Amino acid sequence: MIIITIRITVMRMDWKTYVTHGNRCFHNKHWVDAERHYGLALHAVEKEEPVIHQNGDILFAWLACHHNLATLFQSQSKHSEARFYLDTPLEILEKTLGNTPPDDPFFISLLRAYQTGLNALCLFEKAMNSTVASTATSQTQENVK
């Protein structure tokens, strides 16, 4: 009897590759694939524990993964899911900022990440408010007819 062993090597992509694939899927409106790739990117980045290891580049990659998922869900009008991916990093960053002394060199990276997150949330809220306003205007115009 002959036994043949087949060795399969599974190539794990890094978070940058997942984001690149996610972006490609997003631009082609392949929402399910984009969500999967962005989710895998987020999972890969979270393994690096950006807040614990105080790595600014990984911290911003982590934040970008959340924002990509938020943008993906917002483009599909899944606003509560989008909001989740905007709120979650802000909550973690806020807690971490509260536990980090201002003279810690990583404090500035945390603060910048928090500001970036707040800006994204403000843009989301502005878009939601303009959507609500335009919907209300359309309904009012329909009622007037």
Which functions belong to the PLM regions below?
Residues I2-T9, K47-F60, K95-R112, K126, ...:
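Acidic, Ser/Thr-rich low-complexity linear motifs
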Residues R112-K145:
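Terminal, low-structured helical/coil segments at or just beyond the last alpha-helical repeat
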Residues Y18-V19, F26:
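Alpha-helical tetratricopeptide repeat
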Residues Y18, L59-W62, H66, L111-Y114, ...:
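TPR repeat positional signature
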Residues E35, G39-P50, T88-G98:
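Amphipathic alpha-helical segments of tetratricopeptide repeats
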